[in-house]
């Protein structure tokens, strides 16, 4: 019997429901406000008569509400509205309102309501799906592994008021809920400490989660990896007592016409290996499996949403540790498929496990291959903490980057210059895992991975070294620590491909 593992803590506890009327016994009502040319504007809710709407507006104005983006103003309730208090959430200029502005506002509102039991909101009138996502993800509260629950607890329940078509509202609500839950799963996995999440336990958690929704699951242990020649994964994982794994997930709906392979880096902890990282900030390396968590969440979301696309996810899992058996600078390894690589720096390990996984995924001959990783510090230097770098086949690369910006997960297309590709070549092997230059590190990693993509496959590589893990303050619906970026981007990419 296989060992049983589970995540030590999760962060999404808020209940979501849809209603056509204001429920009884709610604590608060959240309403949208706008910044108009002449001051505060209050969107009519359709729940109350004009006099009550004006009374709400009067009180909001009296306390200085402006309707600007990011504003959250709490006022006492008024006679005739059976709630304890009312919250006005600023959406800015009505003419420039977009989904992510709404999503951020809902996240701001949810965070301000921590500890409240039950609220209702009319924010969904301007976009039910982004309102649902924003509230759920803004309320996300990962308290960690504690002997006693940390207070205040997150917002307990949100009722979304929808006065429109019931069927359409239900569909939009469900999509938002599934996507929010998938992002939360990604966050939970990334937030889990490496003492609890390591290759064996992680593979088991993926298996148990995936099997519940009917995905196909295959797990290769270290013996099968060695037998099949996964030299990159084995090299990285050999220094740890916690041996590597490779997980394969499959979603194969009927009548799907196209296929995509997903690959995500799963380094459950990265010390840098023999090329040891500095001690300061090394604890953040629990997040070095953010790419794998993204792809697990993405394929699960695709299955739950019924996306008509054949999807496989190939997830390499390893822990990069120094030790008597660890791989060394100067080693030459043979990847799955036969390409050899000179190791110049053991802290450039992510591309080694990805290379094996990409080569294996390419054997399935998918139409598209999408891989993601917290891969290079160079991504943060070039694009900052919130914008992902996207490389690969021109058309698919640009499509992925545009989709990210469209859904509110900033991404930017990056080139793969020929001269950097030349620098990836090795004098003693086919390629080397770093170049001799500090320049263009993000693109050098992209070039390295390109050698393993099968011929004729449209490919995109997304570097999320900064965006996957928020070390600064909370903003909108983004908490500290794991962000869940870019799950929403990838779910939309898959949906777009299925509809083509």
From Swiss-Prot:
Catalytic site: 277, 351
Listed SUPFAM superfamilies: Macro domain-like, Zn-dependent exopeptidases
First-level EC class: hydrolase
Sequence positions that bind Mn(2+) 2: 265, 270, 288, 349
Taxonomic superkingdom: Bacteria
Catalytic activity as recorded in UniProt: Release of an N-terminal amino acid, Xaa-|-Yaa-, in which Xaa is preferably Leu, but may be other amino acids including Pro although not Arg or Lys, and Yaa may be Pro. Amino acid amides and methyl esters are also readily hydrolyzed, but rates on arylamides are exceedingly low; Release of an N-terminal amino acid, preferentially leucine, but not glutamic or aspartic acids
A GO-annotated cellular component: cytoplasm
Localization terms from the record: Cytoplasm
Cofactor(s) in the UniProt record: Mn(2+)
Manner of cofactor binding, per the entry note: Binds 2 manganese ions per subunit.
Annotated GO biological process: proteolysis
EC numbers on record: 3.4.11.1, 3.4.11.10
Residues that coordinate or bind Mn(2+) 1: 270, 347, 349
UniProt keywords, alphabetically: Aminopeptidase, Cytoplasm, Hydrolase, Manganese, Metal-binding, Protease
GO terms, molecular function: manganese ion binding; metalloaminopeptidase activity
InterPro entries (alphabetical): Leucine_aapep/pepB (IPR011356), Macro_dom-like (IPR043472), Peptidase_M17_C (IPR000819), Peptidase_M17_leu_NH2_pept (IPR023042), Peptidase_M17_N (IPR008283)
Protein's job: Presumably involved in the processing and regular turnover of intracellular proteins. Catalyzes the removal of unsubstituted N-terminal amino acids from various peptides.
Family: Belongs to the peptidase M17 family.
Protein name: Probable cytosol aminopeptidase
Organism: Corynebacterium diphtheriae (strain ATCC 700971 / NCTC 13129 / Biotype gravis)
Gene name in the database record: pepA
């Amino acid at each position: 019997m296989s060992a049983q593992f589970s995540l030590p803590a999760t962060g999404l506890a808020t209940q979501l429901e849809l209603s056509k009327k204001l429920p009884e016994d709610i604590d608060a009502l959240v309403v949208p406000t706008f910044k108009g040319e002449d001051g505060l504007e209050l969107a009519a809710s359709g729940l109350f008569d004009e006099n009550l709407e004006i009374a709400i507006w009067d009180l909001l104005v009296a306390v200085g509400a402006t309707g600007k983006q990011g504003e959250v103003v709490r006022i006492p309730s008024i006679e005739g509205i059976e709630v304890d208090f009312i919250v006005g959430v600023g959406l800015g200029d009505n003419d420039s309102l977009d989904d992510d502005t709404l999503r951020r506002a809902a996240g701001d509102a949810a965070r301000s309501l921590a500890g409240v039991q039950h609220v209702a909101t009319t924010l969904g009138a301007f976009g039910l799906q982004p309102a649902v996502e924003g509230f759920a993800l803004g309320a996300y509260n990962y308290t960690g592994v504690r002997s006693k629950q940390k207070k205040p607890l997150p917002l307990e329940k949100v009722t979304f008021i929808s006065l429109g078509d019931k069927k359409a509202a239900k569909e939009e609500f469900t999509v938002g809920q599934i996507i929010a839950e998938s992002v939360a799963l990604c966050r939970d996995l990334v937030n889990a400490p490496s003492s609890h999440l390591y290759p064996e336990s992680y593979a088991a958690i993926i298996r148990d989660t995936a099997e519940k929704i009917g995905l196909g699951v295959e797990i290769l242990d270290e013996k099968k990896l060695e037998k099949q020649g996964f030299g990159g994964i084995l090299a990285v994982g050999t220094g740890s007592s916690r041996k590597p794994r490779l997980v394969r997930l499959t979603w194969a709906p009927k009548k799907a016409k196209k296929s995509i392979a997903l690959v995500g880096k799963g380094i459950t902890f990265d010390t840098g290996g023999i090329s040891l990282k500095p001690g300061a900030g090394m604890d953040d390396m629990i997040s070095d499996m953010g790419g794998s968590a993204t792809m697990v969440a993405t394929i699960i979301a695709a299955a739950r949403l019924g996306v008509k696309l054949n999807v496989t996810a190939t997830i390499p899992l390893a822990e990069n540790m120094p030790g008597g058996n660890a791989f060394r600078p100067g080693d030459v390894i043979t990847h799955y498929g036969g390409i050899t690589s000179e190791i110049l720096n053991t802290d450039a390990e992510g591309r080694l496990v990805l290379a094996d996984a990409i080569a294996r995924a390419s054997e399935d001959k998918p139409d598209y291959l999408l891989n993601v990783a917290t891969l290079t510090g160079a991504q943060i230097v070039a694009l900052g903490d919130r914008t992902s770098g996207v490389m690969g086949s021109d058309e698919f690369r640009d499509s992925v980057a545009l989709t990210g910006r469209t859904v509110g997960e900033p991404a930017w297309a990056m080139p793969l210059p020929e001269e950097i590709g030349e620098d990836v070549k090795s004098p003693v092997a086919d390629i080397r895992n770093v170049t001799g230059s500090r320049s263009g590190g993000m693109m050098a990693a992209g070039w390295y991975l390109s050698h393993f993509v099968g011929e004729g496959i449209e490919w995109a590589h997304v570097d999320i070294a900064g965006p996957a893990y928020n070390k600064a303050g909370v903003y909108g619906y983004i908490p500290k620590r794991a962000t869940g970026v870019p799950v929403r981007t990838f779910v939309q990419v898959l949906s777009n491909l299925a509809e083509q």
